[in-house]
Amino acid sequence: MKLSFSLKNSFKLTALSSLFGCGLLGLSLSTSAQAEGKLVLYCSVQNTTCEKVAHAFSKKYNVDTQFVRNSTGTVLGKIKAEKENPQADVWYGGTLEPHFQARDAGLLETYRSPLQKEIMPQFKKLTEQRGDTTSIIYLMELGIGMNEKLLAEKNIAKPQCYADLLKPEFKGLIQYPDPRVSGTGYTILTTLIEIMGEDKAFAYLKELDKNIAQYTKTGLATANISTGAAAVDVGFMHTYVREKDKGAPVIGALPCEGTGYTLGAV
């Protein structure tokens, strides 16, 4: 699948989305899918984390908690499509901007978590202004992940910069999260625009497209670089640490041009 860069105007740097609830606590939501003793969770973090969150809530409150795991953009699309007949009670995880978009579209219930008072000082203003439907629950840094064993076998130097990924030796070796459906992909896009400027960022992505083996629907498909299905990935640093901890020859690098971060929400 190749991206159409005529979509440029749809990715202007505008603040997008939010949701409701906070952490594992009082996740009271929309007027819909609430059946007595049952809670449906749309989850945009790793599947294992979704399982742990659902289990912890079920155990603490004696509520049958079920989850559906999708990328941030996919969940936002589902919530929009289900506006007149909501199918879930809580949206847990995923990048903050799509949560704000849901808030601005009136898709979320008002709920301000009492835990917001514990937020890091630099995010207090944002929380005060837009925390009426969502809460920040984590922070993640962007980086370049790579299978160092596969790169060594191909005699390719480890990429340290976004610019390195344009080199011809990386043709067919890179996977990249599709910014149309992936919150990770959107965060990479906005970071590149911040670093390079809008026109240069889209020119960069058009050039990078020549080296892309596949566009993934989620930024969490890092198992592909562990198995060698891809040699290089652009995503969040913690995902590469997780693969390395499993024993895979995977490392991450913070791009030399600078990097961005995202806030996760519930």
Where do the protein language model's features map onto the residues?
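Bacterial N-terminal signal peptides that target proteins for export
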Residues: K2-L19
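Extracytoplasmic ligand-binding site segments that recognize negatively charged/polar headgroups
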Residues: S44, T48-E51, Q87-A229
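A ligand-binding cleft/hinge motif common to bilobed small-molecule-binding domains
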Residues: E97-Q101, A231-P249
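C-terminal segment of classical bacterial N-terminal signal peptides
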Residues: F20-S32
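Periplasmic-binding protein-like
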Residues: Y204-L208, A213-Y215, K244-V266
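Generic structural signal for residues in well-ordered beta-strands
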Residues: T65-F67, I174, V250-G252
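Residues embedded in well-ordered beta-strands
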Residues: V40, G143-G145, G260, A265-V266
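Early extracytoplasmic/lumenal segment of secretory-pathway proteins
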Residues: A35-Q101, A223
